[in-house]
């Protein structure tokens, strides 16, 4: 019985300690490091003025931008633009370079306060944290000037980009090559960029399309090793992920030539990606430049296409820019046949558990309208799925408790003869038809479930700012209350390491009660471990997302109920009330 209990709580402890290690040894130091780096970058940022001339090839640095430091409004106002207005997005397209460099997400705010500013995804290069996408061409001598970062396009069709009204931009160079770019947008986050190239010149021209996602500086949001942020793409059917730190330390990463695939930059909740023409080969490259300020660039370069005099060609790119909503990303993956585009969301190693778990939670959310309730119902479903295994576990624990007196007799009989004791114990298990390892399998199986749930709560945007009841306004953030100031009654917060919210306390109480369901271990070390473990876990989980803590508290409650029912059926005494009573009863001093 004690062995099963010990295995159970050791397994839980290891699971949580791994997550806590990520939090304290990686997340917090990285938060401080990123904050300091961002502050230094903002103090020292200087970029050389832009120069004209030949457009750079993909994988090379863009011509420098204007000196950063302009406000976003100033940078947007100084160039001619085409407005973007959809149910999900607002912003504009810069007619210089036809850049997507002004984009905000209407449905998402910076904080849980609905009056807080909406999320800004793209900003012009002239701002401190420029972030944009663009599509251009590399030509030969016969092609003349081709569309690139400095090209000024003319709006020739449409006035505002909406789901119902595409816009057309045109550019004709000195060699008689006309580029007509039609841009359309759906109700969510996918732009279609279709270029029609007509050669009215006297010589054939060779053109290679390229597409870039460029970001100045690393994002200031804290990074964490539980998910990937940075460069992402699919080449040759394989997912390519390169973090910011890795690309800073190494040469550019070139996944290689591929037919079919995509590339871009991903954050925890947002992403920018380009899907090149899928029927022709192209190269993908991830690069980092330090020409004045850190610049991260993901780009592709397509194979050259020859357009004869009097002939035309068409090049179609897709640009994703927005929130990584699961249903939207899955729809794009299927509708546009984009290879592994669903990998834009980092489901982790246990994706085969994480994805179904999210879909289950999303189903219950749509049913009940609250993700907190969805977590509770999902926990019940998971409990039902694992009920046969858990039933065996608790039945085994109950049987172990029944033979506890016989085990104690064997220990006295064999004393220090460990080999003899082990053989006698195995014979006892055989006679009583007890499998001492029966309680381990449910625990081992449930560990991936725990990690999968943590992943769902942490990385899915659907959980961001999702409220529960009462004071929990964001299930993806820690419980905001703290016992230090009597849960808000006193006018101070206290040190961060003492922040202990109501839900972590509830979780600690349920864990304490669950452990008191069984007799206190005779071994003093185990007894001390069982006594202090709930308190330690309470403080450790205080910094975890509230949704995970609520899950743990609810799971403990269901486990207590399940264990009580099984123990009653097995005729085994439930020690909970005796153990609680013993906490307030003075133990007699041992006789001298």
UniProtKB/Swiss-Prot annotation:
Required for the insertion and/or proper folding and/or complex formation of integral membrane proteins into the membrane. Involved in integration of membrane proteins that insert both dependently and independently of the Sec translocase complex, as well as at least some lipoproteins. Aids folding of multispanning membrane proteins. The gene is yidC. InterPro entries: Membr_insert_YidC, Membr_insert_YidC_N, YidC/ALB3/OXA1/COX18, YidC/Oxa/ALB_C, YidC_ALB_C, YidC_periplasmic_sf. GO terms for molecular function: membrane insertase activity. Residues 41-69 have a biased composition (Low complexity). Belongs to the OXA1/ALB3/YidC family. Type 1 subfamily. Keywords: Cell inner membrane, Cell membrane, Chaperone, Membrane, Protein transport, Transmembrane, Transmembrane helix, Transport. GO terms for cellular component: plasma membrane. The keyword Cytoplasm does not apply. It is a multi-pass membrane protein. It comes from Sinorhizobium fredii (strain NBRC 101917 / NGR234). Interacts with the Sec translocase complex via SecD. Specifically interacts with transmembrane segments of nascent integral membrane proteins during membrane integration. GO terms for biological process: protein insertion into membrane; protein transport. PANTHER family: CYTOCHROME C OXIDASE ASSEMBLY PROTEIN COX18, MITOCHONDRIAL (PTHR12428:SF65), OXA1 (PTHR12428). This is Membrane protein insertase YidC.
